Amino acid sequence: MASSVRRRAFLHAAGGTALALGLSGTAAATPSFAASADEPAAGSEEFAALRAKWRDLVLGTGFSPTAEPFKTLLANLGTTAQKHLSTMAPASGSLWPDAVWADPDPNTDAASYAFSAKMNDSYSRLSVMAQAWAQPGTGLTGDAEVLDAVLTGLDHVNSEVFNTATQQYGNWWNFQIGAPQALMDTCVLVHDHLTAEQITKFCAAVDHFVPDSVFDNYSGTSTGANRVDLCRSVILRGIVGEDRAKVELAAGSLAPVFPYVTAGDGFYADGSFIQHRNVPYIGGYGAVLHDGVGRLLALLRGSAWELNDPNTQLFLDTVDKAIAPFIYNGLIMDNVSSRGISRFGTSEHTRAIGLLGTLVLIGQGAAPEENARWRAMVKGWMQRDYYAPPLKSPGLSLNRAAQLQDVLDDTTVKPAPEPVEHRLFHNMDRATHRRRDWAASVSMASRRIAHYEFGNGEHARGYHTGAGWLSWWGSGFGLEQYSDAFWPTVDPYRLPGITASRKPLADGQGGNWGQPCPDVDWVGGTTDGEFGATGQHLKGLESTMNAKKSWFWLDDSVVCLGAGITSTDGYAVETTVDNRALGAAGAPELTVDGRSQPGQQGWSRTFEDAEWAHVEGHAGYVFPCGARLSAVREERTGAWKDINTGGPADPITRRYLTLYTDHGTDPTDATYAYVLLPGASARTTAQRAGDRGWLRILANSGDQQGVHVAELGLTAVNFWAAGTVDKVTASAPASVLIREHRDGTATVVVSDPARRAVSLQVTWHKRVSQVLSRPAAVTAATTGASLKLTFGDLTGAFGAPQKIKVKLG
């Protein structure tokens, strides 16, 4: 506001009435929510203590406002709040001219979504102003004009739209989660300056939009992260209004979030997290759930409503099962963030910051060994993130900064290195492979998991992110790969690793919230925890294209096989070996079969029988069977608005170096085979290409795909159909991985990715003297000249690997 708008004067001028918005009436009088007379006097003190706790959780504690990064963050907060203060202009239908919530035709269409978002945004701006008023070092600390503006704004939004007489319109989330949370956060910060009448009105509005009935059933929009957010809305409303019943109801309603699920939204025993029925979302809603539960656990600890549910340990276990496998050197992998990757101003790195802070917070209530392990992980991730160090993020909040700085300053915490492991998430069609110097992950789709999600105008060109997208990062390079305007500029038909028809798809193909799923079942794989085999029966979105794709994850490489590639779309089908983002001016050397290729933009060439290729500073690529390899250097221009209606329209240009195989128009049973060597030098790549005995491709057809790597003692086969490959026979579709160890033992791991095997027999034609361990799923095992394993009904295993240990000889 250019000048202070006195709260009561404004309401008098406005007549204290609500804008019609196509709706009717003003907020009705509601009884006060203060503690009843028969409650103990200590009740108010307990609520005051909880408000103080929440205030600390919002603002952060334990930092010096004159030390960096806090000094700069506080100054930035003050600058933002001052901008809001200067531009605030209460009027009918808005609190700011650029945030009009008045909807002339309130319903649930896209326009109404936008109007309701402006109401939510108005509360968020008031929260920022309240934080600047409450925090030291902002230049607005304790400023009377700021406080008056916040109180005026709260009254205005309540009078106009967020009240008991307004009917919800647009996006339900804005009315039940976004606005209530921002409103209650603000009320906590300025609580001592609110009148009883204001508290009553604000709490009544929350009760109106978030009635007790939202907790009646764990379904619809009241599951997973949304349930946690709804609980937070009501718990804070109870604390602000000192209503014990509200706090008790909402705290108890967290219980369904903790147990693992076997279908629908929530965490699964394998570490998968699903929201919106079939979308992997650890980096989005999963992060929200973790943050919400973490804060509420901390808030209620030691109170009458402390969460003592034994299933909270299941939630804590998801740190290691679900969160950590997708964080690499300070980033959260894009393939578990869905629509979030299309949002301007965010990246794999910025999305990880909240999770890192959450791990620090929830660790305070975990077992000492868990807390120590998580703090070590967080410290290692922060120290290794050379591209976007969390404490230098311009959007970092004060509470997150305080949490992360505390870990960095703690000399008792030694940074944990990246683990060496392979993780299969068979309930969300993802796999991660982590080495000390690099990490990779594959993104797939099936009857259970959507190709992608489009909604709210977000993620308009994500249609091929489930087509075998293989993303990877190096420890000292490549952390910027998908974070430097990758999504608005990359060719969406040439994501790394995918096989796709060039048939043009419309933005948002599949429909708003359509979440299209292919009608295929065999998607998944198996792993011994260090190496892995993953497979995808791929059916293209709105396409006739079919393919069988496999990835075999080794110590320093990933073997990628494709077969049965068939299409009748009338368009070319391509497999993208890799598509390296080079920033605004990158031009790394490309070498193919020992010959350096031109570096100018616009260059392209097809190599008829390439054996290997190398991109300086990135990776090596080996083609064991030779490949008709196409390469292109190009500059691509796009805008965030192209993929997200909420993004800016400013054009951005980035360079790309793409390697791909063109299978031709309407191919029949086309194949490919290549090996990705992240971080390898040209010399190492050439040596690997020349070592004909290192890798044996045992099969690469539409029926089976398999490899053998003698030096690793590894044999892995994806059986799309029953058959025999080398020394392994499967009686039905299955994924099999065998590791022979130097101590004379071997590990055999088998899964049923299609979830259809009511019986399965796997035979390894290798002399075995004894079965050392086996799961209950193995109903019979015979040894001798061959190992024969008989499995019972595997449909209830949901594609989980079954591990057997045997003694050779």
Predicted regions and their residues:
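Secretory targeting signals
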Residues: 1-5, 21
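N-terminal mature-domain "stem" immediately C-terminal to a signal peptide or N-terminal signal-anchor/transmembrane
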Residues: 43-80
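C-terminal beta-strand-rich structural cap/linker in extracellular carbohydrate-active enzymes
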Residues: 673, 788-809
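Small-residue (G/S/T/A) turn/hinge positions that recur once per unit in extracellular repeat modules
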Residues: 776-780
